[in-house]
Amino acid sequence: MSYTELESGYQDISQQHQQQNPHQSQPQQRVGFYLGLQDGNGDTDFGDSNDGMDSDTSTSSSNSKQVVVGICAMAKKTQSKPMKEILTRLGEFEFIKLVTFEENVILREPVQNWPTCDCLVSFHSKGFPLEKAIEYAQLRNPFVLNNLHMQYDIQDRRRVYAILEKEGIEIPRYAVLDRDSPDPKHHELIESEDHVEVNGITFNKPFVEKPVSAEDHNIYIYYPTSAGGGSQRLFRKIGSRSSVYSPESRVRKTGSFIYEDFMPTDGTDVKVYTVGPDYAHAEARKSPALDGKVERDSEGKEIRYPVILNHSEKLISRKVCLAFKQTVCGFDLLRANGKSYVCDVNGFSFVKNSNKYYDDCAKILGNMILRELTPTLHIPWSVPFQLDDPPIVPTTFGKMMELRCVVAVIRHGDRTPKQKMKVEVRHPKFFEIFEKYDGYKLGHVKLKRPKQLQEILDIARFLLSEIHTKAHAEIEEKESKLEQLKNVLEMYGHFSGINRKVQMKYQPKGRPRGSSSDDTNLAADQPVEPSLVLILKWGGELTPAGRIQAEELGRIFRCMYPGGQGRSDYSGTQGLGLLRLHSTFRHDLKIYASDEGRVQMTAAAFAKGLLALEGELTPILVQMVKSANTNGLLDNDCDSSKYQNLAKGRLHELMQNDREFSKEDRELINPCNSKSITQALDFVKNPVDCCHHVHLLIRELLHIISIKKDDPKTKDAILYHGETWDLMRCRWEKIEKDFSTKSKLFDISKIPDIYDCIKYDLQHNQHTLQYDQAEELYIYAKNLADIVIPQEYGLTPQEKLAIGQGICSPLLRKIKGDLQRNIDEVEDEFMNRLNPHYSHGVASPQRHVRTRLYFTSESHVHSLLTVLRYGGLLNVVTDEQWRRAMDYISMVSELNYMSQIVIMLYEDPTKDPTSEERFHVELHFSPGVNCCVQKNLPPGPGFRPHSHGDNACNVSLQSSDESNPARIEEENDSNSGEEREGKKRGTSGQRSTDRSAERISPAFGFNRLELRSKQFKSKPIPIGAHHTVSGHEAMDLAKRLNEELASHQQQQNQQLRPISPDIRAVTPDCEPRSRSFEQRPTSGVCAKEPDSQVSVSVSASVSSANASTSSRRQRHSIAGQMSYMKMLGFGGFSKKMATSANSLFSTAVISGSSSAPNLRDMITVSSSGFGDVPPIRPLETLHNALSLRKLDSFLQDMILAQIFKTPTGSPPRGFSKNTLPAVSSMTLTASNQTEVVEHEPISTTVTPTFDRRGSESGSTADAHLRLLSESQCPNLDDSNTELRESLAGKMELWPQDIVKAAEDEELNLSELETKPSLDLTMEIMERGVAGIASIQPMNRDSDETMGGGVFLSVCEEQGSGSTCLTPVSFGMDLDLSMVANKGSITLSMEGFDDDEDATLSAATTPSLLADCEPRLESCYCCPSHAEAPPEVPSDDPRFGFALPVRVTQASPEHARPVRRAHDPVSPRIQKQISLFEGNAAMATGQEKTESSGSVGGGAILHASINLPAAGPHHLRQDARLRKFENLTQSTSNSNFPFESNTLKRVPMQTTKDYDNVSHTQSCINLKSGSSGVLGGSPQRQRGSDGGGVGASGVPAESREPTRVHYGRMNSTCCSASASPSPSPGALIVKERFIEPPKRGVVRGYHGKTQSMDADFLFNEFLLLPAMAPAKISFDSSDIDQASDDDSPSSSKQRHA
């Protein structure tokens, strides 16, 4: 029987009784105090007492004996409101009579004169004579509610902790410093800068210092220097303060204290109030340690929030109540690290301001007293039914979706310019410091702590004094730098540990020289001694403006949570829902920040705004912000910096050409065709001229600074953030020197610094500086920076993706986990949140919202954006929302301060839990703060200034171009009331004014009516609508939007694009309807400005049977540019959609509305908001119809993806032959038009084999056939159905592994975008089964076969020799050990189990070695790239080609010669292996074999791989060897992977046993005439060697006719040096390739389909022989090129 049923029965009996005795029950109107009464809904209601039901005792005579309850406490307590409330309710019990002892009596009268009572409620407070109360209890022997003797213990924190420990209750680690003890061992204290040692126990800061007396509330918390130092001093509340921050960092020297670890509690404390062992009321309040500001409600009471305790906490509450023998007892809980700790026991105390608690408490106490005393006093009282706990009443969900998770990645706020100075030092004092901090172990030291910086400062002062007293040449040379070192270290008067750092690096042979500002007085021939390079870094601190931005953004963020716009329950502020959520533990908030001070302070300021905190940032930082560098989450020291440097090198070389950018230059600099970069290139024209102009402007600026510095009127002027004229001059002088190098070239890497500095000075110092050309310098620097900064993260999409994945893989993994945990959570564990009785305005009290905020620097924002943009999340062709989003991102020129990417996960509990519509994901992005200056716009079509949304901000554009009028305010579309509503705009500076006032200004220079008539309305896609937009709905939405756009395209073709204001209103009443792309001349603009958003898609492998669903799931890759959330407001949908996200986001971009920001013009706005704090642009919704499954699989692919490749997912193994899965291919962006053009065919070789997985091969063949027939030619019309049928007929001939390689290498094909004219067709040649050879796998009995190859070659129109572009390739350093190698592993990782805790550490991706520096060339011909570029709709003429496919029969003699596993190892491999083992001796003596035809002693691998001695053939498997070694190395997590018994050689049959497998690991392109990678001399490579097997594995007699053609198909691709002009498609850069970042093996979470054992690895990577064509069909045109084609035609082989 349930409690409810019992209660119901009990009530029925009582009511019948009342009806029988109406005369008795009528006069008694008192409330009955019983637990578990029922409300009208049939739910058990703990708190409803006024239900008209009387106490059972109503039948008794009112004259019978009563229980006398004596209240013995100080008057201040007995007269307090909570006590009065409870006593009033207790007095309503018929059998209870209350007697309150007067304070005078208690203090002055002997206990004999005190009133007598049956039950004593007595408790200690300041001034209370506890000993008299004990004496009274012994005299009268009443029933004592709270044990009096134990109240002595409660007054001593040492005893409290001892009792808690004895009961097994968790408490913080602590130690007692007892200065009163005679034993010196009890008061040993050693204090250091960042820790104290108490009686031998060390406490690192932050720690807590508590007086041993519980009556002393002066508790101090000490902070570490890394967070700014100082301490927070807590005290009993005085007014609205409960603590204050103090800069004092030293502990107190008098008195006895308890020292304990500080527990990070996310800023809230839980206060628990027991009433007996079975009842506990808990509430949360803001921790006094956070900011010391007491939150009070409108009545001035401290705001507290009810909390539901979890099971373990209820047990703690019971234990505390019983251990201290206090029926009524309060104690403090800290929830930290997943546990609950008791940190204080307060004894008798009541909850304030909770009527519900007063009811409960009086009921429980009354019943407890009566139950105890009525039997002895013979009172006829029957015990009512009781419930231990109030039941949980879940609220109904309704139609709104429930927000479950918010993940945001946010860049830090406005900062001072970062500055750096290097100086070479040799003084012994520096070496002493270096040694002291273990510099010789690592080769470098980082000094950040105040004490360390003080030591460096002391040395600098000492050396400077030495210089002045006695000249010393070595020191003198550095005087200016030492002076600067001293000035910087003395700058703020104190060291806080977050704004300066010194690094020292050991240079055994002195320091290599760099730019002109380096100290370079040493002669070149001077003998060099070891030295230290001292690098001083300062600046880069968060400015006050940055703090305001972050705080305001935090405040805005509140509004996206449930109840954010609802009624104001407590403080009347916006975003209240979040504050309640947080304080009631329904908000699971974690804030991570990388370790830079500016990032941490941004995070703290954001938390301050988000949670409405006050006070200093240091305490908030310590409690709320977790450092993400402990787990490498936001670490910047990742390997991809090496590859970034190589990309930078290529970019910088391209920017050194002293000529206007040619078409080729543009294609090389901006292969992704980003609109913002195109725009900047148009402005810059000649990069050298532009740099020269910038240099001149900087010199002028320096001249002005020197004048102002000496001018008596201005020399004392205070610059922003306390900077002096001297410091400003030093800053600009260093930039000026560094920018212009000794060779008279410009150092392009300084452009970001120049832009940084001028942006800072223009925003903060222009009023003092008054430099007339500041804006001009800003504009030039910005345009240069718009090219340099984004392209330093890679030029091509593949480079960008590779570098991006290298930087943000750990973060992606964490985000994936954040989203996943919401689905998997166990309900029981989360029952510790909001009491449902208080859940007004919150969707469901038992659930919680997970918020994860990651604050980081620009690199992570860029990387995450790149991964979203190019990783293949959605398809720009089929997904209209995504196309618009990508367009928008392409226009974003800069990821400014406070840029954000936000992912929001919603759940619809009404949907089936397994349905894809259950969880719904939205993706938002903001480019951060606005630029700080209005600037001229380059003339040209499509540019139109936009409004700031505020008439007062109207600024005229200084533009001579008539089509560039002054700023045009937002159009007022008077046709629609809804639209008028949507035009409300506000700025941050106007938050206090009426934001809903419309600000419409007249048009300037435009016929507004004409514009309006051309406008059309598209319904915005509402965010947070009443149902999930997913499945077919998303497709319909996109289709509808498309049709609307299409219907208006023609008339808008010539029209200029309007731009929305960057500001949107914050108020929930203002829902601006934004219409960004409505007036966009979609087809026209696209045609003029092709933007190849090349997104390399991850194939979703879903059944094509459900066409619409599958196409939806395969939408293309995310362009997620991180941007600032506009602090000021956001817009986007009608009021009937009002949900938690209401008015927070703009859906302008995806809904195709006219107010979407058009960032192409890079317009900046005048400062608005807080003085000179520019406002933040709104979060634009990139997509609001994503399914969680889609996003999850995308993140999984990105985490597992091999660098440089798009992670193409493979089709699921084992579906039947008649289901052909649709596999999405790489899609080059964009438009709805496709040209299909016939061209001459190119030849393709397909070698079918049996798949070694047996029966699976047929089904996967279907998939791959479809891959080649459909994804490569998606737009072939019906005339090509014959082709498809003929392909279908051959599907059995397609081996899984071949096309797997094709899928894996898909990404390289995207490079086709680099040249407009490519003739591509495909000819598929079959082979008979006769040509199939087999492989003997290790430890297998059966012969299973594997092999085959798919090749493409490209025939260019000019016939200038083939080209090969490996977009991001491998570093060729011979001295790089394998451990350090980062190549690209091509194993598809889908089959491995996911290990959530796996770390991305082990190197799995080796580099390939070469004898020479390769050129970067363009390759569509390598076997591994076994696919032609896909046919996609595109408005870019470069992609307007068709790909006819011709199937021809190949004869069996095309079988290729085979390489056996026991063939000799090439010397290159040998060298690599010996390097890996650190055994240099092994490498010697191998070199000579390269010039002969065979390898002699190169067969040694590692002792544990038992390969036979040299044979007649070359083992061309180094790629797989290294891949295999590194893979096993990473899977075993050991330095060297092999156990000698793991891999045993099985004797092989003959060479004919294998088929050659020809898949390049990467196209390594070698210079002409150099020795081949795979062990052949140049002569042999050119075919001059008479016998044996050539480098390509072709018999000598057949080599000559085939080499030319195959050179393009299989080789390292004829280099550009062989022909005078680069071939179309070639990207020729002389730098070496970019190495990919190190990747670890991460296991997939799908079913385990392949065991990752040694056999599998060995077979998969090591024993698959390389393959080359014996005879290949070729055109006569190929032979013509034979004489030109002089480069080696061997390619590193690998099996995908």
Curated annotation (Swiss-Prot):
<feature type="binding site">
    <location>
        <position position="285"/>
    </location>
    <ligand>
        <name>substrate</name>
    </ligand>
</feature>
<feature type="region of interest" description="Disordered">
    <location>
        <begin position="1567"/>
        <end position="1600"/>
    </location>
</feature>
<dbReference type="Pfam" id="PF00328">
    <property type="entry name" value="His_Phos_2"/>
</dbReference>
<feature type="region of interest" description="Disordered">
    <location>
        <begin position="942"/>
        <end position="1001"/>
    </location>
</feature>
<keyword id="KW-0418">Kinase</keyword>
<dbReference type="GO" id="GO:0006020">
    <property type="term" value="P:inositol metabolic process"/>
</dbReference>
<feature type="binding site">
    <location>
        <position position="236"/>
    </location>
    <ligand>
        <name>ATP</name>
    </ligand>
</feature>
<dbReference type="Pfam" id="PF18086">
    <property type="entry name" value="PPIP5K2_N"/>
</dbReference>
<dbReference type="GO" id="GO:0000827">
    <property type="term" value="F:inositol-1,3,4,5,6-pentakisphosphate kinase activity"/>
</dbReference>
<feature type="region of interest" description="Disordered">
    <location>
        <begin position="1069"/>
        <end position="1091"/>
    </location>
</feature>
<dbReference type="GO" id="GO:0005524">
    <property type="term" value="F:ATP binding"/>
</dbReference>
<feature type="region of interest" description="Disordered">
    <location>
        <begin position="1676"/>
        <end position="1696"/>
    </location>
</feature>
<dbReference type="InterPro" id="IPR029033">
    <property type="entry name" value="His_PPase_superfam"/>
</dbReference>
<feature type="compositionally biased region" description="Low complexity">
    <location>
        <begin position="14"/>
        <end position="29"/>
    </location>
</feature>
<feature type="binding site">
    <location>
        <position position="287"/>
    </location>
    <ligand>
        <name>ATP</name>
    </ligand>
</feature>
<feature type="binding site">
    <location>
        <position position="210"/>
    </location>
    <ligand>
        <name>ATP</name>
    </ligand>
</feature>
<feature type="binding site">
    <location>
        <position position="332"/>
    </location>
    <ligand>
        <name>ATP</name>
    </ligand>
</feature>
<keyword id="KW-0808">Transferase</keyword>
<keyword id="KW-0963">Cytoplasm</keyword>
<dbReference type="InterPro" id="IPR000560">
    <property type="entry name" value="His_Pase_clade-2"/>
</dbReference>
<feature type="binding site">
    <location>
        <begin position="269"/>
        <end position="271"/>
    </location>
    <ligand>
        <name>ATP</name>
    </ligand>
</feature>
<keyword id="KW-0597">Phosphoprotein</keyword>
<comment type="function">
    <text>Bifunctional inositol kinase that acts in concert with the IP6K kinases to synthesize the diphosphate group-containing inositol pyrophosphates diphosphoinositol pentakisphosphate, PP-InsP5, and bis-diphosphoinositol tetrakisphosphate, (PP)2-InsP4. PP-InsP5 and (PP)2-InsP4, also respectively called InsP7 and InsP8, may regulate a variety of cellular processes, including apoptosis, vesicle trafficking, cytoskeletal dynamics, and exocytosis. Phosphorylates inositol hexakisphosphate (InsP6) at position 1 to produce PP-InsP5 which is in turn phosphorylated by IP6Ks to produce (PP)2-InsP4.</text>
</comment>
<dbReference type="InterPro" id="IPR033379">
    <property type="entry name" value="Acid_Pase_AS"/>
</dbReference>
<feature type="binding site">
    <location>
        <begin position="236"/>
        <end position="237"/>
    </location>
    <ligand>
        <name>substrate</name>
    </ligand>
</feature>
<feature type="compositionally biased region" description="Polar residues">
    <location>
        <begin position="953"/>
        <end position="963"/>
    </location>
</feature>
<feature type="binding site">
    <location>
        <begin position="260"/>
        <end position="263"/>
    </location>
    <ligand>
        <name>ATP</name>
    </ligand>
</feature>
<dbReference type="GO" id="GO:0052723">
    <property type="term" value="F:inositol hexakisphosphate 1-kinase activity"/>
</dbReference>
<dbReference type="InterPro" id="IPR040557">
    <property type="entry name" value="VIP1_N"/>
</dbReference>
<feature type="region of interest" description="Disordered">
    <location>
        <begin position="1233"/>
        <end position="1260"/>
    </location>
</feature>
<feature type="binding site">
    <location>
        <position position="271"/>
    </location>
    <ligand>
        <name>substrate</name>
    </ligand>
</feature>
<feature type="compositionally biased region" description="Acidic residues">
    <location>
        <begin position="45"/>
        <end position="54"/>
    </location>
</feature>
<feature type="region of interest" description="Polyphosphoinositide-binding domain">
    <location>
        <begin position="394"/>
        <end position="465"/>
    </location>
</feature>
<dbReference type="GO" id="GO:0032958">
    <property type="term" value="P:inositol phosphate biosynthetic process"/>
</dbReference>
<feature type="region of interest" description="Disordered">
    <location>
        <begin position="1"/>
        <end position="31"/>
    </location>
</feature>
<feature type="modified residue" description="Phosphoserine">
    <location>
        <position position="974"/>
    </location>
</feature>
<feature type="compositionally biased region" description="Acidic residues">
    <location>
        <begin position="1677"/>
        <end position="1687"/>
    </location>
</feature>
<feature type="binding site">
    <location>
        <begin position="344"/>
        <end position="346"/>
    </location>
    <ligand>
        <name>ATP</name>
    </ligand>
</feature>
<keyword id="KW-0547">Nucleotide-binding</keyword>
<feature type="modified residue" description="Phosphoserine">
    <location>
        <position position="1060"/>
    </location>
</feature>
<feature type="modified residue" description="Phosphoserine">
    <location>
        <position position="1001"/>
    </location>
</feature>
<feature type="region of interest" description="Disordered">
    <location>
        <begin position="43"/>
        <end position="62"/>
    </location>
</feature>
